[in-house]
């Protein structure tokens, strides 16, 4: 297949859809759709979102030193898109979408109670990169619906029905597709064929329901040393 050189642009597939909850200086709860974001550190557990200074959420995070990151399900796709279309300076996004603001018990930030789960974060670091500033939040807790918990007692993507954004190359929202294989397992045969019987790194580490009760790294699975 012929390869084509393209100009640099912010494109990856896929992107998580992340709804960032904050309080303003006036105490008003706000919610926005952050296009750029994801997990950025295992210990301490951290998530990052990148925001423009023009957004209300940018200023709210600096004021409150906290934010939440909620993961919407497929039934929230219209609401998730809406909160990225209008500004909290002019709209009450919780009221407009019918989502219910719930104050986090761990940080000074709201979350949408209808979302399957939300990360509760204190502002850990922030760095201006250019047009965007990256806000790194230390995850102090997770508030989740009991019925979306799966292996290790954590939210399961098949149960949360989390949605994905196709990115700059395909500006649509998508549902999670078919399961292809278990991470840190499906490549075992290939590794054995290339390296003999060396121990395989990774795989399930905790029996179901025992997450957090074992000593060891805080991350859910061990990453290969690459």
Briefly describe each language-model feature range.
Residues 1-218, 226:
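Basic, polyanion-binding surface patches
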């Amino acid at each position: 297949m012929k390869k084509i050189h393209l100009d640099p642009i912010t494109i990856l597939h896929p992107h998580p859809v992340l709804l960032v909850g904050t309080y303003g200086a006036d105490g008003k709860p706000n919610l926005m759709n952050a296009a750029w974001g994801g997990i950025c550190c295992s210990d301490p557990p951290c998530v990052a979102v990148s925001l423009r200074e023009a957004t209300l959420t940018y200023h709210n995070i600096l004021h409150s030193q906290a934010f939440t990151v909620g993961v919407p399900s497929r039934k929230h796709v219209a609401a998730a898109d809406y909160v990225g279309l209008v500004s909290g300076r002019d709209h009450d996004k919780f009221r407009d979408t019918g989502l219910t603001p719930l104050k986090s018990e761990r940080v000074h930030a709201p979350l949408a109670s209808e979302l399957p789960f939300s990360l509760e974060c204190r502002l850990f670091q922030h760095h201006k990169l250019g047009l965007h500033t990256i806000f790194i939040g230390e995850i102090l807790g997770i508030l989740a619906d009991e019925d979306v918990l799966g292996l290790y007692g954590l939210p399961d993507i098949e149960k949360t029905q989390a949605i994905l954004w196709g990115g700059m190359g395909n500006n649509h929202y998508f549902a999670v597709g078919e399961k292809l294989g278990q991470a840190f397992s499906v490549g075992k045969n290939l590794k054995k064929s290339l390296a003999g019987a060396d121990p395989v790194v990774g795989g399930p580490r905790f029996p179901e329901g025992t997450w957090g009760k074992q000593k060891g790294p805080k991350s859910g699975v061990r990453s290969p040393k690459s």
